[in-house]
From Swiss-Prot:
Superkingdom: Bacteria
GO function term, MF aspect, one: metal ion binding
E.C. designation(s): 3.5.1.88
Cofactors that this protein relies on: Fe(2+)
Protein name per its UniProtKB record: Peptide deformylase 2
Enzyme class, spelled out: hydrolase
Chain residues that bind Fe cation: C108, H150, H154
Gene that encodes it: def2
Assigned protein family: Belongs to the polypeptide deformylase family.
Length: 185
C-alpha cells in the first residue's frame, strides 16, 4: 500500500510533475457545475493536486479550484505567500464559522484581466482534508480568507463576477468576448 504524501511534500512533488491543465474561461457553463465530495485520497487525486498547483503557479495565480480545470471534485489549491512556497491543499473543504465583512478587490484565472470589489467574511474557520488524508481545521483571515471563499464558490458553481450588478456582468462579458476575438485574430 502506498503511504499518503505528507502535506509538506506536495510543493516538492510539483517540481517534478509538469502538467499544465487547461483553465476554463467564464462564461463556460462547466464553471457552474457543483463539485462532488472526494471519497478518498488516491494516486489520481495526488496527481491532480500536483497538476493543479503547477497550473496555478504557472498562470500565475494564488488559488485554483478543481472546477476551473473541468474536474468537478471538491479540491482547492492555494498559495498566498510572497515566496510562492506555502502550498495549501483543501480537499472537501467546508466553512464552519465566519465573522466580519470586508470588501476586497478580486480577480480570477477563469475571468482573465477582470478585477472588481466583492464583500466577503473577514475571517473564516475551515474544516478540510489534507493531501495526507488527515482532517484538519484552520482559521484564516485577510487574503487567505478571501481566497478560500472565492475558491469554495467555484466548487459550488459560482464565479465572483456573479456577485456584481447585471450591468457590470454584461460589460465584463463584452470585454471577454473582445479579448477572445483578439486572440483568434
Amino acid at each position: 500500500m502506498i503511504e499518503p504524501l505528507p502535506r509538506i511534500l506536495v510543493s516538492e512533488l510539483c517540481k517534478f510533475v509538469m502538467a499544465i491543465l487547461n483553465i476554463l474561461r467564464y462564461p463556460d457553463e462547466r464553471l457552474h457545475k457543483i463539485a462532488t465530495e472526494v471519497p478518498s485520497i488516491t494516486r489520481e487525486i495526488r496527481t491532480l493536486v500536483s497538476n493543479m498547483a503547477e497550473t496555478m503557479y504557472a498562470a500565475p495565480g494564488i488559488g485554483l479550484a478543481a472546477t476551473q480545470v473541468d474536474v468537478h471534485q471538491r479540491i482547492i489549491v492555494i498559495d498566498v505567500s510572497e515566496t510562492r512556497d506555502e502550498l495549501l491543499v483543501l480537499i472537501n473543504p467546508e466553512i464552519i464559522a465566519s465573522s466580519g465583512n470586508a470588501e476586497t478587490q478580486e480577480g480570477c484565472l477563469s475571468v482573465p484581466g477582470i478585477f472588481d470589489k466583492v464583500t466577503r467574511a473577514e475571517e473564516v474557520t475551515v474544516r478540510a482534508t489534507g493531501i495526507d488524508g488527515k482532517s484538519f481545521e484552520m482559521d484564516a483571515s485577510g487574503l487567505l480568507a478571501v481566497c478560500i471563499q472565492h475558491e469554495m464558490d467555484h466548487l459550488m458553481g459560482k464565479v465572483f463576477v456573479e456577485y456584481l450588478s447585471p450591468f457590470k456582468q454584461s460589460r465584463i462579458l463584452s470585454k471577454l468576448k473582445k479579448q477572445a476575438r483578439r486572440q483568434i485574430a
